[in-house]
UniProtKB/Swiss-Prot annotation:
GO MF terms held by the record: ATP binding; ATP hydrolysis activity; DNA binding; excinuclease ABC activity
A Gene Ontology term for the protein's cellular component: excinuclease repair complex
The gene coding this protein: uvrB
Species the sequence originates in: Mycoplasmopsis pulmonis (strain UAB CTIP) (Mycoplasma pulmonis)
PROSITE patterns per record: HELICASE_ATP_BIND_1, HELICASE_CTER, UVR
CDD domains linked to this entry: DEXHc_UvrB, SF2_C_UvrB
Keywords: ATP-binding, Cytoplasm, DNA damage, DNA excision, DNA repair, Excision nuclease, Nucleotide-binding, SOS response
UniProt-listed GO biological process terms: nucleotide-excision repair; SOS response
Record protein name field: UvrABC system protein B
Amino acid sequence: MFKLHSNYSPSGDQPRAIQELAEDIEKNKKHLVLQGVTGSGKTFTIANLIAKFNRTTLVLSHNKTLASQLYSELKEFFPENRVEYFVSYFDFYRPEAYLPSTDTYIDKTSKTNNELDAMRMSSLNALLTRKDTIVVSSVAAIYGAFNPQEYQKNFFSIEVGQELKRKDFFLDLVKRHYKRNDVNLVPGSFSAKGDVVEIAPAWTSDFAIRVEFFGDEIEAIATIDPLNKTLKKRHKNYLIFPANAYSTNKDIVSRVVLQVKEELIDRLDYFEKNNKLLEMQRLEQRVKSDMDSLEEFGICSGIENYARYIDGREQGEKPYTLLDYLPEEALVFIDESHMMVPQLNAMFNGDRSRKQNLVDYGFRLPSALDNRPLTFSEFEEYKFPKIYISATPSEYEIEKADQKITKMIIRPTGLLDPIIETRSKTNQVEDIYDELQKQKAKNERTLILTTTKRFSEELTRYFQEKGEKVAYIHSDHKTFERNEILRKLRKGVYDLVIGINLLREGIDLPEVSLVIILDADKESFLRNTKSLIQIVGRASRNSSGKVIFYADFVSKSMRETIEDNFEKRQIQIQYNKEHGIVPQTIIKDIPEPIEGHGFEHSIEYFLSNEKKSKAQLKEKEKLILDLKKQMLEASQKMNYERAIHLRDLLIELGEKL
């Protein structure tokens, strides 16, 4: 079922890790831990397990960027299978809220990314129709989704030779929220010209569906290129999915409206008895407007707040989520579990406190509280085998796995963990300056991690006065600004970057051979064992990698990190010796900046200049068009990481202007 495409075979610790994990899965163990260093091939190990077991798979990642990287890698490993991407479809999202202290109501504001929305629908469709499906998702996986049984009822199939009146076919499409548009065929619409009906699926822009009629009979079905209308493939039959994941039929709408009105009566009675007339009026107006829209159009603004009734759930019953679309035997991989598990645990409480105010003050019915993410205990109730993956797994994962950890320490590339040196804080700035001169002589880059914003700024000014090519990354920087600074570091525009929390999971800077950690002995979230190990691991892409701890004494976290580092180095050195491997720095392409624009026309220019002439605004429009073109090209080439990066730039341009 799954066919793994790769030019290499498992090596290093990979064969043993694959075997250990496979044996535990076969023994029906539900919790497994894979502890792997950076560069040990954890994604390739996941791919081998997927291919071995031929089970539908969910891979969870704690942010969109890393999820997109995993998606791209798995898509390369499994080009003949369905690899899907399920994350939040909002480019911008501000949830509905009410602040009683200032009597401020904040309406929901969002900007939907249609491409991500289509990919979410594609994920649901694939899970319900194909077993050879891999879905890469973020925390969005535990948020509400439509009841899979009800959603599947909205699928309908057509076949060549089927007797079907065109008007009945149109009605079937409209019931599933397709809109007729004979002028511009956009996703989720259809056009009818003579005996030919063309449908633009809501779940993909790769093709359109052409259905040709002869009288009241379907004569031909084909998928075509949506732009030039050339034939892609002929079909004997075709399964058509809804245009909206919250498709509702008349029976459901009638039931929902009845149940909502019953709850409304009870709630209005409650407000009246408690002399809350403003809340009473507010709620009645809101709910009646929603129900009028639902009865007329089958959908309304904020329909998710009535999810309990749409799904047919009882009060307090857990919501349907992406997890309910998985078959019972599915595999679940939790990447960077030390970050992902706490994220899963935190979602419910934050959502609940916000919505409780909306209910208490008459903006929503109490049933809106059931439009929520899963609680962590509900997530735990799913019996899929869960494989936790991290360089630094937490106590939760280890305890769940009965203390058994499958380790991957050896890198097939032969690269070692960087050497760690501990130095006194005395004269540390002068010492760092000397190190920077050595780095420049080798044409290698440096990162410095501080603990305060003030010290970062002072250190940056000091090195600038010394003539160093240095940049400072801080929390005020937008996504594109951080990425651009790091790109310029790799390119050599900067030799040094200073910051507080630079080395987050997933950062990849092969040109950096020196990482300096100031105040390494200050036990804190950024200086505990897990954080230090993560930092050291991120500096392991260069064959001459080195980490310097500046400290007055060796803290417990420092000692544990140094011991961990020494053990990993010895294992890798022995492996390299046995296999004749000479470690070499990873060669990785440096992404180009936005093409065709000098600084005057760059993104920084448009964001930093508040007063803009008409000429400058025209240049801004030209830049936006160029960005959109590059984003589309990156998406078509399945370079989703770059596409998402370009999308973020567009959003930030829009916010500033």
